[in-house]
Design a protein with these regions (language model features):
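A glycine-rich phosphate/pyrophosphate-binding beta-strand-loop-alpha-helix module
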Residues: 9-46, 50
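Short, structured coil segments at secondary-structure junctions
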Residues: 9, 39, 59-61, 117, ...
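Short, acidic/turn-prone active-site loops that include or flank metal/cofactor-
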Residues: 19-21, 68-72, 126-129, 252-253
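Anion-binding alpha/beta catalytic cores of soluble intermediary-metabolism enzymes, centered on
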Residues: 41-113, 209
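Rossmann-like adenosine-cofactor binding region
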Residues: 141-237
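C-terminal helix-to-coil terminal segments
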Residues: 224-269
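Short, small-residue-biased leader/transition segments that mark boundaries at the very start
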Residues: 1-6
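Rossmann-like dinucleotide/phosphate-binding beta-alpha-beta segment
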Residues: 93-153
Length: 269
């Protein structure tokens, strides 16, 4: 999708995969950043540690875009907020419920974004999966200035009452040990987004997911989960995913528009 966005804007793209890059191995991140900054007009990093993309940005001398790290996913946030505006008309005051594992890039980024935009963010999950306290405290400080609220709860009925948006992300990833899958699935089963989760939400409430989603048996992971745990759906049911509240494909399209806008804004004189 990113390569398509670049080409659509009349630019040229070079892709460096992990096996083709010596970043942080044979060559330090500051050195790599300065070399790439002499060769390219912009750099997108999609990888692991947040500190890597921040160090690239410090030394590159050209725009550096965070395509995703373990901690944050800012380009997805622009797409998500655009999608909410398209369907609900405004952002400020929106009650946004995130169900599932809220410890990583999506939970973190959505909480920060909601805090900055005056939205009411609710992380609804097993307390083991709450965002880290330091980030929660930061978001509460921001929320005090914007009129936002930050709530952490394990009560689905309370969390989803009058919700405008219910959002989730995958619980498991390829390559993780089976025992990790088992623990996470067991802990997060009560926080599956299903029709019951929408019973207390507003009639206009929408369902969002950054994709990919495990809502049926048409994927390798979906089949593996069914064989090992007997579940045909994970973080969201097929009924919700394919239902009238779901805006996930508008959301996916909006990543393209958002990435183009970010590139134009940061590369323009």
């Amino acid at each position: 999708q990113r390569q398509m966005c670049i080409r659509d804007r009349g630019m040229h793209v070079t892709y460096l995969d992990p096996s083709g890059s010596q970043i942080g191995k044979k060559e330090s991140i500051p050195d790599t950043a300065r070399v790439l900054g002499r060769m390219f007009d912009g750099i997108e990093y999609r990888g692991y540690g947040q500190e890597i993309v921040e160090e690239l940005a410090k030394y590159a001398g050209v725009p550096v875009w965070n395509g995703l790290t373990n901690e944050f996913h800012p380009t997805q946030m622009i797409a998500d907020m655009l999608t909410i505006r398209e369907h609900l008309g405004e952002l400020k005051g929106v009650k946004f419920v995130y169900m599932g594992d809220a410890r990583y890039n999506m939970g973190n980024s959505l909480m920060v974004t909601c805090a900055k935009l005056g939205m009411h963010f609710v992380a609804c999950t097993n307390p083991k999966y709450y965002p880290n306290k330091e980030l929660v405290d930061y978001c509460k400080d921001v929320a005090a200035q914007t009129g936002a609220t930050i709530t952490l709860t394990d009560d689905v009925a309370e969390a989803t009452k009058d919700a405008d948006v219910i959002y989730t992300d995958v619980w498991v990833s390829m390559g993780e040990p089976e025992e990790v899958w088992a623990e996470r699935i067991n802990d997060l089963k009560p926080y599956q987004v299903n029709t019951k989760a929408f019973e207390n939400a507003k009639d206009s409430a929408i369902f969002m997911h950054c994709l990919p989603a495990f809502h049926d048996l048409k994927t390798t992971i979906g089949k593996q989960v069914y064989e090992k745990f007997g579940l045909s759906e994970l973080e969201v049911t097929d009924e919700v995913f394919e239902g009238p509240r779901s805006v996930v494909f508008d959301e996916a399209e909006n990543r393209m528009h958002s990435i183009k806008a970010i590139m134009k804004a940061t590369l323009s004189d």
